Amino acid sequence: MKLQVLPLSQEAFSAYGDVIETQQRDFFHINNGLVERYHDLALVEILEQDCTLISINRAQPANLPLTIHELERHPLGTQAFIPMKGEVFVVVVALGDDKPDLSTLRAFITNGEQGVNYHRNVWHHPLFAWQRVTDFLTIDRGGSDNCDVESIPEQELCFA
């Protein structure tokens, strides 16, 4: 099957998580007016432990054509990925309880100025870079036992 890749927007992505960006977002000034603070862009939710981690993940570019055959989810915490050098990347997401609901499977491409924060229990493809090696600032839950993986029928990403 082919899965159409759509431009990422908060409206289209809202069921799956938050788009982390400054475009069309409110801000206020701090530090004597020298800084615009774009406050509360995403909810970080962590259950059953007291440690939120900030990490850097260095992702390798995916091989083309890109096919998706598994999704993962994190039931105990949100997970955010923010590209550190303005790189475009692709996210694949789905809703569902015990298994991904393929009727909700969606793929999005960022504009290079966006990050994503997956809600708890949102199925998503593991992180990968798009065109070149990419460093991602990652915010998620520490500890183990927070990753479910499910195989899905193969999907080939289709770019307009």
UniProtKB/Swiss-Prot annotation:
Keywords of the record, alphabetical order, are: Lyase, Purine metabolism
Q: What is this protein called?
A: Ureidoglycolate lyase
Indicate the family of this protein: Belongs to the ureidoglycolate lyase family.
Biological process (GO) annotations held by this record are: allantoin catabolic process; purine nucleobase catabolic process
User: What CDD domains has UniProt attached to this entry?
Assistant: cupin_UAH (cd20298)
Stored SUPFAM superfamilies: RmlC-like cupins
**Its domain of life?**
Bacteria
| Catalytic activity of the protein | (S)-ureidoglycolate = urea + glyoxylate
The gene coding this protein:
allA
> Subunit notes for this chain?
Homodimer.
Q: What induces it?
A: By glyoxylate and allantoin under anaerobic conditions and by glyoxylate under aerobic conditions.
GO molecular function (one): ureidoglycolate lyase activity
Q: Which InterPro entries match?
A: RmlC_Cupin_sf, UAH_cupin, Ureidogly_lyase, Ureidogly_lyase_bac, Ureidoglycolate_lyase_dom_sf
| Documented EC number(s) | 4.3.2.3
Pathway field of the UniProt record reads:
Nitrogen metabolism; (S)-allantoin degradation
Q: Which residues form a coiled coil?
A: none
Q: What does this protein do?
A: Catalyzes the catabolism of the allantoin degradation intermediate (S)-ureidoglycolate, generating urea and glyoxylate. Involved in the anaerobic utilization of allantoin as sole nitrogen source. Reinforces the induction of genes involved in the degradation of allantoin and glyoxylate by producing glyoxylate.
> Which cofactor(s) does the record list?
Ni(2+)
- Organism, as annotated: Escherichia coli (strain K12)
